[in-house]
Amino acid sequence: MIKIINVNPNGVIEYSATEQADIANLPKNVESTSTCQLITAAGLTVYMFQKTGDKTGNWIAI
């Protein structure tokens, strides 16, 4: 499972992928050291991932 470990004031959610399957299901350029935002709209939850320290502003939705 993806465990939420911290929610910082700007809304970024830090997570830990605790099972290998979770890591395998993430896009190849996303690591377990990434930050994650949960965006819920119209009943759907979208996980937005960004590598820690990535200043490009590029988020990957899964």
Residue ranges and their predicted role:
Residues M1-A42:
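Extracellular/surface-exposed low-complexity repeats and stalk/linker segments enriched in Gly/Pro
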Residues Q37-I62:
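Short, surface-exposed terminal/edge motifs of secreted or surface/virion proteins that either
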